[in-house]
Amino acid sequence: MIDILGDWKRSHFCGSITAADTGKEVCLMGWVQRRRDHGGLIFIDLRDRQGIAQLALDPDRDPEAHAKAERVRNEYVVAVRGIVSARPEGTVNPKMATGEVEVEVKELRMLNGAETPPFLIEDNVDVAENIRLKHRYLDLRRPALQSNLVLRHKVAQIVRNYLNDTGFIEVETPVLTKSTPEGARDYLVPSRVNPGMFYALPQSPQLFKQLLMVSGFDRYYQIVKCFRDEDLRADRQPEFTQIDCELSFVDRQDIMDIMEAMIATVFQQILGIELSLPMPRITYTESMARFGVDNPDMRFDLELVEISNIAKDCGFKVFADAVKKGGIVKLLNAKQCASFSRKEIDDLTDFVKIYGAKGLAYVKIQEDGSWQSPIAKFFTEKEIALIDEAAGSEPGDLLLFAADTFKVANESLGRLRGHLGQKLGLARKDDFRFAWVTDFPLLEWDGEARRHVAVHHPFTAPLDEDIALLDGDPGSARAKAYDLVLNGSEIGGGSIRIHNREIQNKMFSLMGITAEEAEEKFGFLLGALSYGAPPHGGIAFGLDRLMMILTGSDSIRDVIAFPKTQKATCLLSEAPGAVDDKQLRELSIRRAVRNN
Protein backbone atom coordinates (compact mmCIF):
# COMPACT_ATOMS: atom_id res chain seq x y z
CA MET A 1 0.00 0.00 0.00
CA ILE A 2 1.31 3.45 -0.94
CA ASP A 3 1.44 6.17 1.71
CA ILE A 4 0.79 9.85 1.14
CA LEU A 5 3.42 12.47 1.83
CA GLY A 6 0.99 14.48 3.89
CA ASP A 7 2.50 17.29 5.94
CA TRP A 8 6.01 15.81 6.08
CA LYS A 9 8.75 18.25 5.08
CA ARG A 10 12.26 17.19 4.18
CA SER A 11 14.79 18.59 6.65
CA HIS A 12 18.04 17.40 5.06
CA PHE A 13 19.36 15.90 1.85
CA CYS A 14 20.56 12.33 2.29
CA GLY A 15 24.14 13.22 1.44
CA SER A 16 24.30 16.19 3.80
CA ILE A 17 24.03 14.60 7.26
CA THR A 18 27.28 14.38 9.22
CA ALA A 19 28.56 13.61 12.71
CA ALA A 20 27.66 17.21 13.62
CA ASP A 21 23.98 16.21 13.25
CA THR A 22 24.22 13.41 15.84
CA GLY A 23 21.18 13.48 18.10
CA LYS A 24 19.07 15.57 15.73
CA GLU A 25 15.72 14.45 14.39
CA VAL A 26 15.71 14.50 10.59
CA CYS A 27 13.29 13.85 7.76
CA LEU A 28 14.86 12.33 4.65
CA MET A 29 13.30 11.47 1.29
CA GLY A 30 14.71 9.58 -1.66
CA TRP A 31 15.15 6.31 -3.53
CA VAL A 32 16.17 2.95 -2.09
CA GLN A 33 19.66 2.17 -3.38
CA ARG A 34 19.78 -1.18 -1.60
CA ARG A 35 18.16 -3.01 1.31
CA ARG A 36 19.90 -5.46 3.65
CA ASP A 37 18.11 -7.68 6.18
CA HIS A 38 20.39 -8.73 9.04
CA GLY A 39 18.01 -11.09 10.75
CA GLY A 40 15.62 -8.60 12.25
CA LEU A 41 17.58 -5.38 11.87
CA ILE A 42 17.06 -3.91 8.38
CA PHE A 43 19.45 -1.43 6.75
CA ILE A 44 18.44 0.73 3.80
CA ASP A 45 20.75 2.93 1.75
CA LEU A 46 18.60 5.92 0.83
CA ARG A 47 19.78 7.99 -2.15
CA ASP A 48 19.03 11.47 -3.44
CA ARG A 49 20.88 14.01 -5.57
CA GLN A 50 23.40 14.81 -2.85
CA GLY A 51 24.36 11.31 -1.78
CA ILE A 52 23.42 8.30 0.32
CA ALA A 53 22.39 7.93 3.95
CA GLN A 54 22.17 4.63 5.83
CA LEU A 55 18.87 3.97 7.58
CA ALA A 56 18.57 1.48 10.46
CA LEU A 57 15.15 -0.02 11.18
CA ASP A 58 14.71 -1.98 14.42
CA PRO A 59 11.43 -3.89 14.95
CA ASP A 60 11.58 -3.05 18.66
CA ARG A 61 11.73 0.69 17.93
CA ASP A 62 8.90 0.89 15.39
CA PRO A 63 7.28 -2.38 14.27
CA GLU A 64 5.16 -0.63 11.61
CA ALA A 65 8.15 1.06 9.94
CA HIS A 66 10.09 -2.21 10.10
CA ALA A 67 7.21 -4.09 8.46
CA LYS A 68 7.12 -1.57 5.61
CA ALA A 69 10.89 -1.83 5.22
CA GLU A 70 10.53 -5.57 4.68
CA ARG A 71 8.47 -4.80 1.56
CA VAL A 72 10.62 -2.11 -0.05
CA ARG A 73 12.88 -2.95 -2.97
CA ASN A 74 15.47 -1.09 -5.03
CA GLU A 75 14.26 2.25 -6.42
CA TYR A 76 11.19 2.45 -4.19
CA VAL A 77 10.54 6.05 -3.12
CA VAL A 78 10.38 6.46 0.66
CA ALA A 79 10.36 9.15 3.32
CA VAL A 80 11.61 8.57 6.87
CA ARG A 81 11.79 10.34 10.18
CA GLY A 82 14.43 9.41 12.69
CA ILE A 83 17.38 10.34 14.87
CA VAL A 84 20.93 10.72 13.55
CA SER A 85 23.30 8.51 15.53
CA ALA A 86 26.95 7.53 15.33
CA ARG A 87 27.52 4.17 13.69
CA PRO A 88 28.64 1.39 16.03
CA GLU A 89 32.39 0.86 16.32
CA GLY A 90 33.78 -1.08 13.37
CA THR A 91 30.93 -0.16 11.01
CA VAL A 92 32.12 3.29 9.90
CA ASN A 93 32.35 3.52 6.09
CA PRO A 94 35.16 5.96 5.12
CA LYS A 95 34.16 5.72 1.43
CA MET A 96 30.86 7.53 2.12
CA ALA A 97 30.53 11.20 2.99
CA THR A 98 27.87 10.13 5.51
CA GLY A 99 29.80 7.04 6.58
CA GLU A 100 30.17 8.03 10.24
CA VAL A 101 26.44 8.17 10.95
CA GLU A 102 23.14 6.42 10.34
CA VAL A 103 19.52 7.34 10.92
CA GLU A 104 17.57 5.32 13.49
CA VAL A 105 14.18 5.34 11.79
CA LYS A 106 11.05 6.02 13.86
CA GLU A 107 8.57 6.38 10.98
CA LEU A 108 8.61 5.32 7.32
CA ARG A 109 6.27 6.27 4.51
CA MET A 110 6.38 4.31 1.25
CA LEU A 111 5.64 7.01 -1.33
CA ASN A 112 5.85 4.86 -4.46
CA GLY A 113 6.87 1.45 -5.67
CA ALA A 114 9.10 0.65 -8.64
CA GLU A 115 9.47 -2.12 -11.16
CA THR A 116 12.82 -3.89 -11.32
CA PRO A 117 15.06 -1.52 -13.34
CA PRO A 118 16.66 -2.84 -16.56
CA PHE A 119 20.08 -2.06 -15.05
CA LEU A 120 21.55 -1.27 -11.64
CA ILE A 121 21.60 2.39 -10.68
CA GLU A 122 25.35 2.45 -10.16
CA ASP A 123 28.23 4.30 -11.82
CA ASN A 124 30.19 1.29 -13.05
CA VAL A 125 27.25 -0.65 -14.43
CA ASP A 126 28.01 -2.58 -17.63
CA VAL A 127 25.02 -1.96 -19.88
CA ALA A 128 24.64 -1.03 -23.55
CA GLU A 129 24.28 2.70 -24.17
CA ASN A 130 21.07 2.25 -26.15
CA ILE A 131 19.44 0.69 -23.07
CA ARG A 132 20.65 3.58 -20.94
CA LEU A 133 19.32 6.16 -23.41
CA LYS A 134 15.98 4.37 -23.73
CA HIS A 135 15.57 4.62 -19.95
CA ARG A 136 17.38 7.94 -19.55
CA TYR A 137 15.28 8.91 -16.51
CA LEU A 138 16.86 5.92 -14.72
CA ASP A 139 20.31 6.52 -16.18
CA LEU A 140 20.20 10.07 -14.84
CA ARG A 141 19.78 8.73 -11.31
CA ARG A 142 23.38 7.50 -11.42
CA PRO A 143 25.66 9.73 -9.31
CA ALA A 144 28.21 10.29 -12.11
CA LEU A 145 25.65 11.69 -14.55
CA GLN A 146 23.98 13.76 -11.85
CA SER A 147 27.39 15.14 -10.90
CA ASN A 148 28.06 16.05 -14.55
CA LEU A 149 24.80 17.99 -14.85
CA VAL A 150 25.25 19.74 -11.50
CA LEU A 151 28.74 20.73 -12.65
CA ARG A 152 27.29 21.99 -15.94
CA HIS A 153 24.89 24.18 -13.97
CA LYS A 154 27.78 25.56 -11.90
CA VAL A 155 29.83 26.33 -15.02
CA ALA A 156 26.87 28.19 -16.57
CA GLN A 157 26.46 30.21 -13.36
CA ILE A 158 30.16 31.09 -13.23
CA VAL A 159 30.08 32.19 -16.88
CA ARG A 160 26.98 34.32 -16.32
CA ASN A 161 28.43 35.94 -13.21
CA TYR A 162 31.72 36.70 -14.97
CA LEU A 163 30.07 38.19 -18.05
CA ASN A 164 27.58 40.19 -15.98
CA ASP A 165 30.47 41.62 -13.96
CA THR A 166 32.38 42.44 -17.16
CA GLY A 167 29.62 44.61 -18.61
CA PHE A 168 27.81 42.09 -20.81
CA ILE A 169 24.03 42.03 -21.23
CA GLU A 170 22.15 38.77 -21.75
CA VAL A 171 19.76 39.07 -24.70
CA GLU A 172 17.63 36.31 -26.24
CA THR A 173 17.63 36.03 -30.02
CA PRO A 174 15.03 34.35 -32.27
CA VAL A 175 14.80 30.57 -32.60
CA LEU A 176 12.59 30.71 -35.69
CA THR A 177 14.68 32.53 -38.26
CA LYS A 178 15.56 32.56 -41.95
CA SER A 179 17.55 29.87 -43.73
CA THR A 180 20.90 31.10 -45.06
CA PRO A 181 22.34 28.05 -46.83
CA GLU A 182 26.04 28.65 -46.16
CA GLY A 183 27.79 25.99 -44.07
CA ALA A 184 25.96 23.04 -42.53
CA ARG A 185 22.39 22.10 -43.43
CA ASP A 186 19.60 23.87 -41.57
CA TYR A 187 16.78 22.25 -39.66
CA LEU A 188 13.68 23.62 -41.39
CA VAL A 189 10.31 24.40 -39.79
CA PRO A 190 7.29 24.80 -42.11
CA SER A 191 5.08 27.84 -41.58
CA ARG A 192 1.36 27.05 -41.39
CA VAL A 193 0.28 30.67 -41.79
CA ASN A 194 2.65 31.21 -44.74
CA PRO A 195 2.09 28.10 -46.89
CA GLY A 196 5.17 26.88 -48.72
CA MET A 197 7.49 28.99 -46.56
CA PHE A 198 9.94 27.73 -43.95
CA TYR A 199 11.76 28.96 -40.90
CA ALA A 200 15.19 27.61 -40.01
CA LEU A 201 16.41 26.76 -36.54
CA PRO A 202 19.57 28.81 -35.92
CA GLN A 203 23.02 27.30 -36.41
CA SER A 204 24.17 30.25 -34.31
CA PRO A 205 22.79 33.69 -33.40
CA GLN A 206 25.50 35.18 -35.64
CA LEU A 207 23.57 37.82 -37.55
CA PHE A 208 21.32 38.83 -34.67
CA LYS A 209 24.22 39.39 -32.30
CA GLN A 210 25.90 41.56 -34.94
CA LEU A 211 22.66 43.53 -35.25
CA LEU A 212 22.69 44.02 -31.47
CA MET A 213 26.10 45.66 -31.85
CA VAL A 214 24.69 47.93 -34.56
CA SER A 215 21.89 48.69 -32.09
CA GLY A 216 24.42 49.93 -29.54
CA PHE A 217 24.27 47.22 -26.86
CA ASP A 218 28.09 47.13 -26.82
CA ARG A 219 28.48 43.75 -25.06
CA TYR A 220 26.05 40.85 -25.49
CA TYR A 221 26.00 37.26 -24.33
CA GLN A 222 23.64 34.32 -24.37
CA ILE A 223 23.87 30.67 -23.36
CA VAL A 224 21.93 29.46 -26.34
CA LYS A 225 20.74 26.30 -28.05
CA CYS A 226 21.86 25.93 -31.68
CA PHE A 227 21.04 23.37 -34.38
CA ARG A 228 22.93 21.79 -37.28
CA ASP A 229 21.69 19.01 -39.53
CA GLU A 230 25.07 17.36 -40.09
CA ASP A 231 26.67 13.95 -39.85
CA LEU A 232 27.41 13.21 -36.20
CA ARG A 233 30.39 11.86 -34.28
CA ALA A 234 31.31 11.29 -30.65
CA ASP A 235 31.61 14.98 -29.78
CA ARG A 236 28.71 16.36 -31.85
CA GLN A 237 24.95 16.60 -31.43
CA PRO A 238 22.26 17.96 -33.78
CA GLU A 239 21.30 20.42 -31.03
CA PHE A 240 24.07 21.89 -28.92
CA THR A 241 24.66 24.73 -26.49
CA GLN A 242 26.92 27.73 -27.05
CA ILE A 243 28.25 30.43 -24.77
CA ASP A 244 27.76 33.18 -27.33
CA CYS A 245 29.35 36.64 -27.01
CA GLU A 246 29.75 39.79 -29.10
CA LEU A 247 31.58 43.05 -28.29
CA SER A 248 31.86 46.50 -29.89
CA PHE A 249 34.89 48.77 -30.28
CA VAL A 250 37.40 45.97 -29.67
CA ASP A 251 40.20 44.18 -31.47
CA ARG A 252 41.20 40.51 -31.41
CA GLN A 253 43.51 40.96 -28.47
CA ASP A 254 40.75 42.49 -26.33
CA ILE A 255 38.42 39.56 -27.00
CA MET A 256 41.07 36.91 -26.36
CA ASP A 257 42.09 38.59 -23.10
CA ILE A 258 38.51 38.82 -21.79
CA MET A 259 37.55 35.31 -22.83
CA GLU A 260 40.64 33.49 -21.58
CA ALA A 261 40.11 35.20 -18.22
CA MET A 262 36.56 33.80 -18.22
CA ILE A 263 37.84 30.29 -18.94
CA ALA A 264 40.50 30.71 -16.22
CA THR A 265 37.75 31.68 -13.76
CA VAL A 266 35.82 28.51 -14.65
CA PHE A 267 38.85 26.28 -14.15
CA GLN A 268 39.80 27.95 -10.87
CA GLN A 269 36.31 27.70 -9.37
CA ILE A 270 35.43 24.25 -10.74
CA LEU A 271 38.74 22.35 -10.63
CA GLY A 272 40.88 24.55 -8.38
CA ILE A 273 43.39 24.92 -11.22
CA GLU A 274 45.16 28.24 -11.78
CA LEU A 275 45.72 28.64 -15.51
CA SER A 276 48.70 30.60 -16.72
CA LEU A 277 47.68 33.73 -18.62
CA PRO A 278 48.05 34.88 -21.30
CA MET A 279 47.47 31.58 -23.04
CA PRO A 280 49.89 30.63 -25.85
CA ARG A 281 49.10 32.08 -29.27
CA ILE A 282 50.19 30.47 -32.52
CA THR A 283 49.26 31.25 -36.10
CA TYR A 284 47.39 28.85 -38.35
CA THR A 285 50.52 28.54 -40.50
CA GLU A 286 52.65 27.59 -37.50
CA SER A 287 50.05 25.13 -36.24
CA MET A 288 49.86 23.36 -39.59
CA ALA A 289 53.66 23.25 -39.88
CA ARG A 290 54.23 21.84 -36.39
CA PHE A 291 51.13 19.74 -35.79
CA GLY A 292 49.42 19.20 -39.16
CA VAL A 293 46.06 20.41 -37.84
CA ASP A 294 44.54 23.70 -36.73
CA ASN A 295 43.39 22.28 -33.37
CA PRO A 296 46.66 20.94 -31.92
CA ASP A 297 46.92 18.88 -28.75
CA MET A 298 49.69 20.63 -26.83
CA ARG A 299 50.02 18.00 -24.09
CA PHE A 300 52.84 16.19 -25.89
CA ASP A 301 55.55 16.83 -28.48
CA LEU A 302 55.62 14.52 -31.54
CA GLU A 303 55.85 17.57 -33.80
CA LEU A 304 55.82 17.12 -37.57
CA VAL A 305 58.85 17.94 -39.70
CA GLU A 306 58.75 18.83 -43.40
CA ILE A 307 61.53 17.29 -45.49
CA SER A 308 60.34 18.25 -48.98
CA ASN A 309 63.67 19.93 -49.81
CA ILE A 310 65.53 16.73 -48.97
CA ALA A 311 63.03 14.40 -50.63
CA LYS A 312 62.56 16.28 -53.90
CA ASP A 313 65.64 14.72 -55.53
CA CYS A 314 65.73 11.40 -53.66
CA GLY A 315 65.54 8.02 -55.33
CA PHE A 316 62.22 7.13 -53.71
CA LYS A 317 59.77 7.98 -56.48
CA VAL A 318 56.74 8.36 -54.19
CA PHE A 319 58.44 11.20 -52.30
CA ALA A 320 60.03 12.88 -55.30
CA ASP A 321 56.84 12.79 -57.39
CA ALA A 322 54.76 14.25 -54.56
CA VAL A 323 57.05 17.28 -54.37
CA LYS A 324 57.16 17.69 -58.16
CA LYS A 325 53.36 17.79 -58.23
CA GLY A 326 53.35 20.65 -55.72
CA GLY A 327 52.81 18.48 -52.67
CA ILE A 328 54.94 18.00 -49.56
CA VAL A 329 56.70 15.26 -47.62
CA LYS A 330 56.44 15.32 -43.83
CA LEU A 331 57.51 12.98 -41.07
CA LEU A 332 56.58 12.27 -37.49
CA ASN A 333 59.16 10.84 -35.10
CA ALA A 334 57.41 8.40 -32.76
CA LYS A 335 60.06 8.29 -30.06
CA GLN A 336 61.11 4.81 -28.93
CA CYS A 337 58.43 3.10 -31.01
CA ALA A 338 60.72 1.04 -33.26
CA SER A 339 59.43 -2.01 -31.40
CA PHE A 340 56.04 -1.63 -33.11
CA SER A 341 55.06 -4.84 -34.88
CA ARG A 342 54.21 -5.01 -38.56
CA LYS A 343 50.54 -5.33 -37.61
CA GLU A 344 50.73 -2.18 -35.49
CA ILE A 345 52.29 -0.29 -38.39
CA ASP A 346 49.63 -1.68 -40.74
CA ASP A 347 46.99 -0.40 -38.31
CA LEU A 348 48.59 3.05 -38.41
CA THR A 349 48.57 2.88 -42.21
CA ASP A 350 44.86 2.06 -42.20
CA PHE A 351 44.31 4.99 -39.84
CA VAL A 352 45.94 7.59 -42.13
CA LYS A 353 44.00 6.24 -45.12
CA ILE A 354 40.84 7.51 -43.40
CA TYR A 355 42.20 11.01 -44.05
CA GLY A 356 43.05 10.44 -47.70
CA ALA A 357 46.67 9.25 -47.44
CA LYS A 358 47.59 6.52 -49.91
CA GLY A 359 50.02 4.90 -47.51
CA LEU A 360 52.49 5.39 -44.67
CA ALA A 361 56.22 4.91 -45.19
CA TYR A 362 58.23 4.04 -42.10
CA VAL A 363 61.81 3.76 -40.87
CA LYS A 364 62.96 2.01 -37.70
CA ILE A 365 66.17 3.45 -36.22
CA GLN A 366 68.41 0.56 -35.17
CA GLU A 367 70.71 0.49 -32.13
CA ASP A 368 73.66 1.45 -34.33
CA GLY A 369 71.69 4.36 -35.82
CA SER A 370 71.11 2.67 -39.17
CA TRP A 371 67.76 2.52 -40.96
CA GLN A 372 65.62 -0.59 -41.09
CA SER A 373 63.01 0.04 -43.74
CA PRO A 374 61.80 -1.09 -47.17
CA ILE A 375 62.58 2.43 -48.44
CA ALA A 376 66.12 2.74 -46.99
CA LYS A 377 67.75 1.60 -50.25
CA PHE A 378 66.38 4.63 -52.12
CA PHE A 379 68.28 7.20 -50.04
CA THR A 380 71.92 8.23 -50.08
CA GLU A 381 73.96 8.39 -46.89
CA LYS A 382 73.82 12.18 -47.07
CA GLU A 383 70.02 12.20 -47.44
CA ILE A 384 69.67 9.78 -44.52
CA ALA A 385 71.90 11.99 -42.38
CA LEU A 386 69.88 15.09 -43.27
CA ILE A 387 66.57 13.37 -42.50
CA ASP A 388 67.92 12.02 -39.19
CA GLU A 389 69.08 15.51 -38.26
CA ALA A 390 65.72 17.07 -39.14
CA ALA A 391 63.84 14.38 -37.21
CA GLY A 392 66.16 14.32 -34.19
CA SER A 393 66.46 10.56 -34.71
CA GLU A 394 67.80 8.34 -31.95
CA PRO A 395 68.14 4.55 -31.69
CA GLY A 396 64.73 3.02 -31.03
CA ASP A 397 62.75 5.72 -32.84
CA LEU A 398 60.11 5.08 -35.50
CA LEU A 399 59.90 7.61 -38.34
CA LEU A 400 56.54 7.80 -40.12
CA PHE A 401 56.24 9.61 -43.46
CA ALA A 402 53.40 11.08 -45.53
CA ALA A 403 53.88 12.34 -49.10
CA ASP A 404 50.85 13.99 -50.65
CA THR A 405 49.12 17.32 -51.16
CA PHE A 406 49.58 19.92 -48.42
CA LYS A 407 46.11 19.15 -47.06
CA VAL A 408 46.34 15.35 -47.08
CA ALA A 409 49.91 15.08 -45.80
CA ASN A 410 49.24 17.46 -42.94
CA GLU A 411 45.84 16.14 -41.93
CA SER A 412 46.79 12.45 -42.10
CA LEU A 413 49.98 12.89 -40.05
CA GLY A 414 48.33 15.44 -37.76
CA ARG A 415 45.50 13.04 -36.93
CA LEU A 416 48.01 10.23 -36.58
CA ARG A 417 49.90 12.37 -34.08
CA GLY A 418 46.75 12.66 -31.94
CA HIS A 419 46.08 8.94 -32.30
CA LEU A 420 49.61 8.08 -31.16
CA GLY A 421 49.33 10.49 -28.25
CA GLN A 422 46.37 8.46 -27.00
CA LYS A 423 47.92 5.08 -27.84
CA LEU A 424 51.19 5.91 -26.05
CA GLY A 425 49.48 7.39 -22.99
CA LEU A 426 50.90 10.87 -23.62
CA ALA A 427 47.55 12.67 -23.40
CA ARG A 428 46.44 12.73 -19.76
CA LYS A 429 42.86 13.81 -19.11
CA ASP A 430 43.94 15.85 -16.06
CA ASP A 431 46.47 17.88 -18.06
CA PHE A 432 44.85 20.97 -19.59
CA ARG A 433 46.80 22.73 -22.36
CA PHE A 434 45.31 25.72 -24.13
CA ALA A 435 46.34 27.62 -27.25
CA TRP A 436 44.84 30.39 -29.35
CA VAL A 437 45.18 29.72 -33.08
CA THR A 438 45.03 32.91 -35.16
CA ASP A 439 45.44 34.25 -38.70
CA PHE A 440 43.42 31.57 -40.47
CA PRO A 441 42.95 31.79 -44.24
CA LEU A 442 39.96 33.99 -44.99
CA LEU A 443 38.84 31.92 -47.99
CA GLU A 444 39.55 28.57 -49.55
CA TRP A 445 38.90 27.39 -53.09
CA ASP A 446 36.14 24.85 -53.65
CA GLY A 447 37.21 23.03 -56.80
CA GLU A 448 33.87 21.30 -57.23
CA ALA A 449 31.79 24.47 -56.90
CA ARG A 450 34.44 26.52 -58.74
CA ARG A 451 34.31 29.36 -56.22
CA HIS A 452 35.80 30.55 -52.97
CA VAL A 453 34.12 29.59 -49.69
CA ALA A 454 34.60 31.18 -46.28
CA VAL A 455 36.85 29.19 -43.95
CA HIS A 456 34.82 30.40 -40.96
CA HIS A 457 31.79 32.36 -42.22
CA PRO A 458 31.16 35.18 -44.72
CA PHE A 459 31.10 37.88 -42.03
CA THR A 460 34.72 37.45 -40.89
CA ALA A 461 36.94 40.47 -41.50
CA PRO A 462 40.29 40.15 -43.28
CA LEU A 463 43.47 41.37 -41.64
CA ASP A 464 43.89 45.08 -42.33
CA GLU A 465 47.11 44.47 -44.23
CA ASP A 466 45.41 41.85 -46.42
CA ILE A 467 42.36 43.86 -47.55
CA ALA A 468 44.15 44.78 -50.78
CA LEU A 469 44.56 41.07 -51.59
CA LEU A 470 40.80 40.71 -52.03
CA ASP A 471 41.11 42.30 -55.48
CA GLY A 472 44.00 40.24 -56.84
CA ASP A 473 44.85 37.26 -54.63
CA PRO A 474 41.91 36.55 -52.29
CA GLY A 475 43.11 33.03 -51.52
CA SER A 476 46.13 34.50 -49.73
CA ALA A 477 44.12 36.83 -47.49
CA ARG A 478 44.17 36.03 -43.79
CA ALA A 479 41.25 36.44 -41.42
CA LYS A 480 40.89 38.26 -38.11
CA ALA A 481 39.78 34.91 -36.74
CA TYR A 482 40.81 33.03 -33.62
CA ASP A 483 40.04 29.61 -32.16
CA LEU A 484 40.67 28.54 -28.58
CA VAL A 485 41.93 24.96 -28.53
CA LEU A 486 42.05 22.76 -25.43
CA ASN A 487 43.74 19.36 -25.56
CA GLY A 488 43.17 18.99 -29.28
CA SER A 489 39.53 20.14 -29.26
CA GLU A 490 38.33 23.50 -30.49
CA ILE A 491 36.23 24.75 -27.57
CA GLY A 492 35.69 28.25 -28.91
CA GLY A 493 35.95 30.18 -32.13
CA GLY A 494 35.33 33.70 -33.27
CA SER A 495 36.46 36.67 -35.31
CA ILE A 496 36.35 40.38 -35.81
CA ARG A 497 33.41 41.01 -38.14
CA ILE A 498 33.13 43.02 -41.31
CA HIS A 499 31.41 46.27 -40.32
CA ASN A 500 31.73 48.00 -43.70
CA ARG A 501 29.02 47.32 -46.30
CA GLU A 502 31.41 47.67 -49.24
CA ILE A 503 33.81 45.04 -47.88
CA GLN A 504 30.89 42.76 -47.00
CA ASN A 505 29.59 42.99 -50.57
CA LYS A 506 33.11 42.23 -51.81
CA MET A 507 33.22 39.14 -49.62
CA PHE A 508 29.89 37.92 -50.99
CA SER A 509 31.10 38.52 -54.54
CA LEU A 510 34.27 36.48 -53.97
CA MET A 511 32.08 33.62 -52.77
CA GLY A 512 30.03 33.69 -55.95
CA ILE A 513 27.01 35.30 -54.30
CA THR A 514 25.46 37.82 -56.65
CA ALA A 515 24.26 41.22 -55.46
CA GLU A 516 20.67 40.03 -55.91
CA GLU A 517 21.28 36.86 -53.87
CA ALA A 518 23.07 38.84 -51.17
CA GLU A 519 20.15 41.24 -50.91
CA GLU A 520 17.65 38.38 -50.76
CA LYS A 521 19.54 36.39 -48.11
CA PHE A 522 21.30 39.08 -46.11
CA GLY A 523 19.57 42.33 -47.01
CA PHE A 524 18.69 43.07 -43.38
CA LEU A 525 22.38 42.82 -42.40
CA LEU A 526 23.57 44.91 -45.34
CA GLY A 527 20.97 47.51 -44.47
CA ALA A 528 22.21 47.62 -40.88
CA LEU A 529 25.80 48.07 -42.03
CA SER A 530 24.66 51.23 -43.83
CA TYR A 531 23.58 52.91 -40.59
CA GLY A 532 26.79 53.34 -38.63
CA ALA A 533 27.88 49.84 -37.62
CA PRO A 534 30.70 49.94 -35.04
CA PRO A 535 33.83 47.80 -35.27
CA HIS A 536 32.85 44.60 -33.49
CA GLY A 537 33.72 40.97 -32.99
CA GLY A 538 32.76 37.97 -30.98
CA ILE A 539 33.23 34.36 -30.07
CA ALA A 540 31.20 31.27 -29.23
CA PHE A 541 32.24 28.46 -26.91
CA GLY A 542 30.80 24.96 -27.18
CA LEU A 543 29.49 24.35 -23.67
CA ASP A 544 28.88 20.64 -24.31
CA ARG A 545 32.43 20.02 -25.51
CA LEU A 546 33.90 22.11 -22.67
CA MET A 547 31.93 20.03 -20.15
CA MET A 548 33.09 16.82 -21.80
CA ILE A 549 36.70 17.88 -21.16
CA LEU A 550 36.08 19.24 -17.64
CA THR A 551 34.44 15.98 -16.54
CA GLY A 552 36.82 13.67 -18.40
CA SER A 553 33.89 12.09 -20.23
CA ASP A 554 34.45 9.94 -23.30
CA SER A 555 31.14 10.93 -24.87
CA ILE A 556 29.39 14.26 -25.18
CA ARG A 557 26.17 12.40 -24.38
CA ASP A 558 27.36 12.04 -20.78
CA VAL A 559 27.16 15.81 -20.17
CA ILE A 560 23.73 16.40 -21.78
CA ALA A 561 20.54 15.51 -19.95
CA PHE A 562 18.60 14.11 -22.92
CA PRO A 563 21.02 13.60 -25.84
CA LYS A 564 20.46 12.26 -29.32
CA THR A 565 22.20 9.20 -30.75
CA GLN A 566 24.70 9.35 -33.62
CA LYS A 567 21.69 8.83 -35.90
CA ALA A 568 20.13 12.01 -34.44
CA THR A 569 17.35 10.07 -32.72
CA CYS A 570 16.06 10.23 -29.16
CA LEU A 571 15.59 6.67 -27.93
CA LEU A 572 13.60 7.91 -24.94
CA SER A 573 10.88 9.87 -26.76
CA GLU A 574 11.37 8.11 -30.12
CA ALA A 575 11.93 11.42 -31.91
CA PRO A 576 11.87 12.10 -34.79
CA GLY A 577 8.47 10.58 -35.38
CA ALA A 578 5.82 10.40 -38.04
CA VAL A 579 3.01 12.95 -38.16
CA ASP A 580 -0.47 12.37 -39.47
CA ASP A 581 -1.75 13.53 -42.83
CA LYS A 582 -4.02 16.16 -41.26
CA GLN A 583 -1.01 17.95 -39.77
CA LEU A 584 0.80 17.79 -43.10
CA ARG A 585 -2.20 19.22 -44.97
CA GLU A 586 -2.35 22.13 -42.51
CA LEU A 587 1.29 22.82 -43.34
CA SER A 588 0.75 22.46 -47.10
CA ILE A 589 3.22 19.58 -47.17
CA ARG A 590 2.88 16.38 -49.18
CA ARG A 591 4.81 13.18 -48.54
CA ALA A 592 7.40 12.10 -51.09
CA VAL A 593 9.11 8.73 -51.29
CA ARG A 594 12.90 9.00 -51.35
CA ASN A 595 14.64 6.67 -53.77
CA ASN A 596 17.84 5.49 -52.06
From Swiss-Prot:
Q: Which SUPFAM superfamilies match?
A: Class II aaRS and biotin synthetases, GAD domain-like, Nucleic acid-binding proteins
> Which GO molecular function entries does the Swiss-Prot or TrEMBL record give?
aspartate-tRNA ligase activity; aspartate-tRNA(Asn) ligase activity; ATP binding; nucleic acid binding
Q: Where is this region: Aspartate?
A: 206-209
Kindly report, in one word, the top-level EC class recorded for this enzyme: ligase
Q: Which cellular component terms (GO) are annotated to the entry?
A: cytoplasm
Instruction: List, alphabetically, the Pfam families matched.
Output: GAD, tRNA-synt_2, tRNA_anti-codon
Residues at which L-aspartate binds: E182, R228, H456, R497
* Broad class of the protein's primary localization: cytoplasm
Q: Which reaction does it catalyse?
A: tRNA(Asx) + L-aspartate + ATP = L-aspartyl-tRNA(Asx) + AMP + diphosphate
One of the GO biological process terms: aspartyl-tRNA aminoacylation
Can you say what this protein is called?
Aspartate--tRNA(Asp/Asn) ligase
Please tell me the species this chain comes from: Syntrophotalea carbinolica (strain DSM 2380 / NBRC 103641 / GraBd1) (Pelobacter carbinolicus)
Name the gene that codes for it: aspS
